[in-house]
Amino acid sequence: MIVAVGHDLIEIARIRRMLEREGVRAERLFTATELAYAGRYRDPAPSLAARFAAKEAFQKVWLRPHGWRDVWVERERTPDGPFPYAAPMLGFAPAIAGEMHERGWVAHLTLTHTREHASAVVILEHLEQRAAP
């Protein structure tokens, strides 16, 4: 059952300006893994903007305060298949992960960006317990 849906849209230029003006701030918003992933690209701003949108979209479904780095976007490497990485997913600090588990919730994430905007949608789903056959 769907519990909540969150969406965020951000201008990539906003993140680019932040990176140019306040390089130290990036470490307050993003994990080292997120920064390393985005740093592989000539222009890291679109990737970081999508990750910022994911954090904002999650905030819209998780109505309690948390730190920027308590939620992050991760991508596991896939050993097989046509793409080197699996679909993006959200990672959580232990307190959030524990509550999500207790409630039986999982978060689904999709990211996209154009030249000007990045967007993220988070769907919070309750996994219903199914009786054994």
Curated annotation (Swiss-Prot):
GO biological process per UniProt: fatty acid biosynthetic process
Keyword Signal: no
InterPro entries found in the cross-reference section: 4-PPantetheinyl_Trfase_dom, 4-PPantetheinyl_Trfase_dom_sf, ACPS, Ppantetheine-prot_Trfase_dom
Cofactors demanded by this protein: Mg(2+)
EC number of the protein: 2.7.8.7
Pfam families: ACPS
Top enzyme category: transferase
Catalytic reactions on record: apo-[ACP] + CoA = holo-[ACP] + adenosine 3',5'-bisphosphate + H(+)
Molecular function in Gene Ontology: holo-[acyl-carrier-protein] synthase activity; magnesium ion binding
Transmembrane parts of this sequence: none
Gene3D superfamilies: 4'-phosphopantetheinyl transferase domain
Subcellular location: Cytoplasm
GO CC entries: cytoplasm
UniProt keyword terms in alphabetical order: Cytoplasm, Fatty acid biosynthesis, Fatty acid metabolism, Lipid biosynthesis, Lipid metabolism, Magnesium, Metal-binding, Transferase
Domain of life: Bacteria
Binding-site residues, Mg(2+): 8, 56
Family: Belongs to the P-Pant transferase superfamily. AcpS family.
Function description: Transfers the 4'-phosphopantetheine moiety from coenzyme A to a Ser of acyl-carrier-protein.
Cited HAMAP family: AcpS (MF_00101)
Protein name per UniProt: Holo-[acyl-carrier-protein] synthase
Gene: acpS
